[in-house]
């Protein structure tokens, strides 16, 4: 089916282009959401009359989206989750969690604007794209950590997995040294020998 795009659609085309798409995509996505019109002779004429109005609306929406993009561009959002020692989350960080983090800061974005292919399932710093407008896209950092202290260490660039391993090794060394130099343990050994 041929359709006329009423706005820019990712991986499809710009506003005003006539593109050929599968019937199901047009009927179930583009047409109901007002992103396209069927490419009939009548609709082509209507589009030419509507084109100036659509371009003005698109420009206003793009300016508003640019203001929002300036607020969130490069922002770092911290999401706290429980995780295993290896850094694997018990659960995941989804689009809904990212939206809630921005809402806590007073910034409203919709689920369709967050471009997250798969849910985040590991601790660390992750780059996520947000399309505030079809023509305006920004990148934000999402730091997933077990605690606020750990999130700060991740943001400073420290490798938390080695820190945890170093702490475990240090604790084992202290425990071994404590057993080696424990004066009570020495007296117990002498008492058992007699």
UniProtKB/Swiss-Prot annotation:
InterPro entries, per the entry: Ribosomal_bL9, Ribosomal_bL9/RNase_H1_N, Ribosomal_bL9_bac/chp, Ribosomal_bL9_C, Ribosomal_bL9_C_sf, Ribosomal_bL9_N, Ribosomal_bL9_N_sf
The protein's name: Large ribosomal subunit protein bL9
Keyword set, alphabetical order: Ribonucleoprotein, Ribosomal protein, RNA-binding, rRNA-binding
GO cellular component: ribonucleoprotein complex; ribosome
Pfam family name, one: Ribosomal_L9_N
One GO BP annotation of this record: translation
Superkingdom: Bacteria
NCBIfam families given in the database record: L9
Recorded family membership: Belongs to the bacterial ribosomal protein bL9 family.
UniProt GO molecular function: rRNA binding; structural constituent of ribosome
Function: Binds to the 23S rRNA.
